[in-house]
Design a protein with these regions (language model features):
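Catalytic beta-strand/loop cores that center a nucleophilic Ser/Cys/Thr
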Residues: 220-274, 280
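Aromatic-Pro/Gly-enriched surface loop or interdomain linker
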Residues: 73-159, 309, 336-339, 345
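Non-catalytic propeptide/linker segments at domain boundaries
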Residues: 89, 96, 266-312
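Catalytic grooves of carbohydrate-active enzymes
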Residues: 304-305, 312-322, 326, 437-460, ...
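Metal-dependent polysaccharide deacetylase catalytic core of the NodB/CE4 family, i.e.
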Residues: 114-116, 197-198, 342-470, 493, ...
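N-terminal secretory signal peptides
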Residues: 1-11, 17-25, 29-31
Length: 593
């Protein structure tokens, strides 16, 4: 592998300017080794604590720049994990039949949730996306059913422990039976955003009964929402508007408040009895430490109110492959072990540089079984309590840029993504990816390479770059016990229509769920430590991770999950782990979440 430092410089230049390039941190150059196989390792004695590793100095001007860059939410063009992608449609698809989602096995409450969503108009496809996300969250507590609100029939609501209605289409024609049942319900109801005025108009005693009256949308810039005495973030350029109120008083309770730029406030979420109203859609412009976490916590009130508060944390070592530096991996693993921190680690089984991008134009193909030192490092990490995770067979695709270099670790393996002028475009499935057999073939090749390296198939998978097609996700559900990642969802999944890959949307979850693809999904709430820009994700330093972990405390049974690449200074890992411990988080194994 050639000139890896320039690889990092290439990423930094996406920040914009030569100043950023000065911050390149040294990285170890590794080569394919041809040594005889090592004998099995004996059990290791407990390791003494490692001395603290001093931080690697970074130019102060650049460090200040990075802090400013991450002090507020940075919009990422064409990033489906920030906001659903795609414009209006000329003809909305048919509403579709109800979708039944499986609850997370072993969930404490085994409640049932009815998710109702909008479908009409050119933006009707958003309703299905938001319903998918709401259903995923509800699966933490039990089974769920999603259906278009226009298909609602009288009495349906009372068959469930709770109902979530997501008003994403202004003026959706809500059935009178739905409005009547909501007003008469003893079931917990969470109403999100639009069309609340249809309920108030249908029930003249609404204000007297509930103690509040929605008024107009307030479009003031709001960057902060307060909840449980904690401030969480909101993308202030989101000008869709948040509902304000003409009156509010007993018996209503303000659960969360928006903070305008002039420090004045107004309600973000209100509850009265069994009825909770949220004045905007939390799934749009979602990021780490976001007001989306408030909804995630409010679901406990509706579905599992006796849940005890606990705050757990996960850490995983990211993007390990046959040419990773074994010394750096073991340094991180030994420090975690010596401090009693369980961890996971990603393994990509085969390193490919098909065009010699980092090797003077000479192609490289390095399978794991040819690297005895890396094999020994992996076995040692397992002895130290590390949990291996699948992270792609090659973590790249063919010999084309997808989207960058065609090299393992840089590119996507299960989805076509292009890059132009620093903007990523999520194109869709790869040409061969027509059904689940293609992804299953990649999984089988991965398992064969691990077997040749004396390892068994991991129980947990993370798709490279958090990107895959619907058949790929479905294949993963049949192959792995869980996925640990953020996930792409598409119109057509709930409605059993043709999948619309032009409108992807991403979601992270703060607790384990059983998602719409049928997989258990582990939390990935904080992203990773990375002083660079890569895949158009802004730099994130330990202070950023810790700040968002503090915001994540608003979820009473939430998990703070982050990843660390051993190519970066060990001090980054140490600072972040200690910061989460100081906040009261307890680190657990990925197998125990």
């Amino acid at each position: 592998m050639k000139d890896i430092e320039s690889k990092r410089r290439r990423k930094l230049l996406l920040l914009g300017g030569a100043l950023a390039a000065q911050a390149c941190l040294p990285m170890r150059v590794t080569r394919a080794l041809t040594l005889p196989p090592l004998p099995p390792l004996p059990p290791l004695p407990p390791l003494p604590p490692l001395p603290p590793v001093p931080p690697v100095p970074i130019l102060p001007p650049l460090l200040d720049l990075l802090k400013r860059f991450t002090a507020s939410i940075v919009p990422v063009p064409n990033n489906p994990y920030f906001v659903p992608q795609g414009g209006p449609v000329a003809v909305p698809p048919p509403a579709g039949a109800p979708f039944s989602g499986t609850g997370l096995p072993g969930s404490a409450s085994q409640s049932s949730t009815l998710v109702l969503y909008d479908t009409t108009g050119p933006w009707g496809w958003l309703g299905e996306i938001y319903a998918t996300m709401a259903g995923n969250l509800a699966s933490h507590f039990g089974a769920w059913v999603a259906m278009p609100v226009v298909s609602y029939t009288a009495g349906t609501l009372q068959q469930y422990s709770a109902c979530i209605y997501i008003g994403s289409t202004y003026g959706e024609p809500l059935p009178a039976a739905f409005l009547t049942d909501v007003y008469a319900a003893t079931t917990n109801v969470i109403w999100i955003y639009d069309n609340i005025w249809q309920l108030t108009a249908s029930q003249p005693q609404f204000a007297a009964r509930y103690g509040f009256m929605p008024w107009v949308f307030d479009t003031s810039p709001v960057a902060t929402v307060t909840y449980k005495s904690q401030s969480v973030r909101r993308y202030s350029a989101n000008a869709a508007g948040i509902m304000s109120y003409s009156s509010i008083g007993a018996p209503a309770t303000v659960l969360a408040e928006c903070v305008r730029a002039d420090s004045t406030t107004f309600p973000w979420a209100v509850r009265s009895g069994n009825f909770t109203y949220i004045g905007e859609i939390p799934f749009a412009y979602m990021t780490e430490g976001d007001r989306y976490l408030i909804l995630c916590d409010l679901l406990f009130d509706a579905l599992a109110p006796t849940t005890a508060t606990q705050h757990r944390a996960l850490v995983r070592l990211e993007d390990l492959h046959p040419l990773s530096d074994p010394t750096a991996l073991l340094q991180a693993a030994e420090w975690l072990f010596s401090n009693g921190i369980p961890f996971g680690f990603h393994i990509t089984a085969r390193y490919l540089d098909p065009n010699g991008y980092y090797n003077d134009g000479v192609p490289q193909d390095v399978p794991l079984h040819t690297q005895p030192l890396m094999i020994a490092a992996i076995r040692t990490m397992q002895l130290l309590g590390g949990v291996m995770m699948h992270h792609g067979y090659t973590h790249q695709y063919s010999n084309i840029a997808n989207p960058y270099t065609a090299v393992t670790g840089d590119d996507c393996e299960f989805y076509r993504i292009t890059a132009s002028n620093g903007v990523l475009t999520y194109v869709g499935p790869l040409p061969e990816d027509t059904d689940s057999s293609w992804a299953q073939g990649r999984f089988d090749s991965y398992a064969a390479e691990l077997s040749a390296s004396t390892f068994t198939m991991p129980q947990i998978s993370t798709f490279p770059a958090y990107s895959a097609s619907v058949p790929d996700y479905q294949a993963a559900a049949q192959t792995f016990a869980a996925r640990a990642e953020r996930t792409l969802y598409f119109p057509g999944v709930l409605t059993n229509q043709t999948i619309d890959y032009t409108r992807p949307a991403g979601q992270y979850v703060p607790y384990s769920v059983q998602d719409a693809y049928g997989s258990k999904v582990l939390p990935d709430t904080l992203g990773g430590i990375d002083p660079d820009v890569f895949f158009n994700i802004p730099p994130r330093l330990p202070a950023d991770i810790i700040a968002d972990a503090q915001r994540t405390l608003v979820v009473r049974d939430g998990v703070a999950s982050f990843f660390y690449n051993p190519e970066d200074p060990l001090s980054y890992l140490q600072q972040t782990v200690q910061g989460l411990l100081d906040l009261g988080y307890q680190f657990v194994s990925p197998l125990d979440v």
